[in-house]
Structures are given as C-alpha cells and as structure tokens.
C-alpha cells in the first residue's frame, strides 16, 4: 500500500479524492492538532462538558471519538449538543461503533434505531470479519441518493488493534487494505498501529492516500491490566499515524485541558518532524 505520510496535511487535502478526508486535514491544519480524544464517559453532561471549548478540550482536538451506546441518558439533546459544539468549534465526530455483522443488520444499526448514527457521526468504523459485504452495505447507506450527508460521512476499517494478543494481523490486515481500495469515496483509511505501506496486498493506484488513526496513545502509561498497550505521540506519528487517539491519558488526567494541550503540542511537533517542517 502506498503512503503519503511524508506530505503535509495541506498538500494531502488539496489532492485527496475523499471529501471528508479533505475536511479532516483542513481541520488539523487550522487547529494545528492531530489529536482525537476518546470520550469514554457515561453521561451526556460529561460528554458535552468534555467537548465544550469554554470548559473543555474543544480548542485542542481535531476529532472527538464517542462510544454513544455507553451513555446512560442518551437522547436527542445529546446529539443536538454535540453537533452544535462540533459545528461551532471545528471538530469532527467519530462514533467508535465497530460495526461487525451482516450487511442488512449494519445498515439498520447505522441508519435506524435509537442511535441514528448516520445523522450525526462524520466517521464510523467497522471490522471486515463478516467480509466485504459490511463495507458495501455501509457505503450504500451513506451514499444513497436520499441521504443528505453523503459527502460528510466516511469509514475507517479496523485493520489492527493495540490490545495484547489481537488477532487483527496478517491476512486480516491485508484483506482490510484490499477491501478499502474498492470504496475510495467512502473508506477514509484505517485504525491501525502503523502505516500499512508495507502490507502485501493488491497494487495501489497512484492517487491512493489512506488516513491512519492510531489508538492507545498515552504519555504516562505503557499499558493497563486488561491488555491495552500504549505508545507515545512521537512513536505513533513516527510509525505513520496521521491522527493519534488518546482516552484516559487525557480525560482521566488531573487536568484534562492541560493534558490535551500537551498531546496537541507533542502530536503536532511529531507531525512537523515527519514532514520535514521542523
């Protein structure tokens, strides 16, 4: 798989075939941040307080990652509040739903039901364990002629995981790349621990530029008791991450705002070093 990680976000935005990827890179450049905060909180108030720039992390992040199904009080107020903050303060919303089912089911999970994820989440993710049909089904939903947000929706394929003993390796990771290539207008890229440029897969078109999100970024810990394995912003970006994802390292810090600033600074400096701008 080809990699354009040595190019600046601005250069990649100018030539990227995916409209949401262009928006994502533009947000990163405008805010000088490649930080995604994983907001693993359990109430609407906690979520909105975390995102609100007047009291929280909004100025320092490019993306907020939600686990909306762990909120104990999810309602339309949750979505209205989150959307308002995202629009006003220039960050994208990534719902970490990890879709993994047959196509007919994931279409309903994405577009219908109580959560109505398609209406508010710019970015979603899925595993390809069910096969290519899961990506095709999600793409059909997001790109339907009667769906008004198609150009503002995109998918990350879960190509690797940071948990100890993960089985998302080898042939599974290669298949993730192969499937992604078939849906360039919908698949933004991957959740992975590194650039997938060395993964053996089908031949890459010259215009290919998949975005890499790396989870498990933490400045103060190397892991937890449940098998999570962490890396620093510098090591993640050095291995090819375009956007670094940190949860407890930020929201569970003694001062989450100061922690977010630190991740923003270190992540951005690592990016500048990678592209030779520092």
Curated annotation (Swiss-Prot):
Top-level taxon: Eukaryota
PROSITE patterns in the cross-refs: OMPDECASE
Keyword Lyase appears in the UniProt entry: yes
InterPro entries membership: Aldolase_TIM, OMPdecase, OMPdecase_AS, OMPdeCOase_dom, RibuloseP-bd_barrel
Residues binding substrate, per UniProt: 40, 65-67, 96-105, 230, 248
Biological process, per Gene Ontology: 'de novo' pyrimidine nucleobase biosynthetic process; 'de novo' UMP biosynthetic process
Pathway the protein acts in: Pyrimidine metabolism; UMP biosynthesis via de novo pathway; UMP from orotate: step 2/2
Protein name per the record: Orotidine 5'-phosphate decarboxylase
Organism: Penicillium chrysogenum (Penicillium notatum)
